[in-house]
Amino acid sequence: PATPDVCTVSILTGGTQIPGSYHLLSVTVNKELNRIPSATLYFYDGEASRSTFEISNSETFIPGKEIEILLGYRSQNDTVFKGVIVSHSVRVRRNSSNLIVECRDKAIGMTLGRKNKYFADQKDSEIMEQIIGNNGLQKEVEATTTDLKEVVQFDSSDWDFLLCRA
C-alpha cells in the first residue's frame, strides 16, 4: 500500500513563481495522444460584492504569458506542463468567486490558419522537422528512409497535416 505524503504544486508564470497568497483550488492537466496538451487552474479569487478580484486584476495570468506547472511530493517537484495562458475568466457563485485559467501547449500555434505548401524530394521526417521548426517548437523526429517525390499540404493547418503524415 502507498504511504500518505504531502503533495506539492508550484506554478511559474513568465519564469516567476506565483505568490503563496494565491489560493489554488485545483489543477487539471490533460495530455492525450494526437491532441494539444492543456491545463486548467482554479483559484479562489476575491469578493463579488466588493468587486475586488486580486488575482484576476494582477498581471500574473495575462493571456499569452508562458506558464509552467510542477507537481510532486515534499517540494520535490517535476514539470508536468509547459505552455501559454490562452484565457482567464471569473466565475461568480453565491458563496464564492473563482478565477479559471486555461492553458495550452505552445503547439496550439500550429492549429491556427489553413496553409498550402508543396514539398519536393524530401523525406517525411525532413518535412516534419521543417514544419515544427517553422513554428518555433523543439523537435525530436525519428528519421524516415523513403524519399518522396512530392507532398502537398492543401488547405490544412500544420497540426492536422502532421497528424496525417505521422
Show where each model-derived region lies.
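Edge/loop elements at the starts and ends of beta-strands within beta-rich repeat scaffolds
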Residues: 32-35, 76, 94-96, 137
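A broad structural signal for short, well-ordered beta-strand segments within beta-sheet-rich domains
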Residues: 21-26, 85-87, 148-149
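Short beta-strand and beta-hairpin "edge-sheet" elements
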Residues: 73-103
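Charged- and aromatic-enriched interaction segments used to assemble
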Residues: 95-166
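Catalytic cores of large soluble enzymes that bind and process phosphate-bearing ligands
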Residues: 33, 59-61, 73, 77, ...
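Juxtamembrane "anchor/assembly" segments of surface/extracellular structural proteins
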Residues: 1-66, 102-110, 126, 142-144
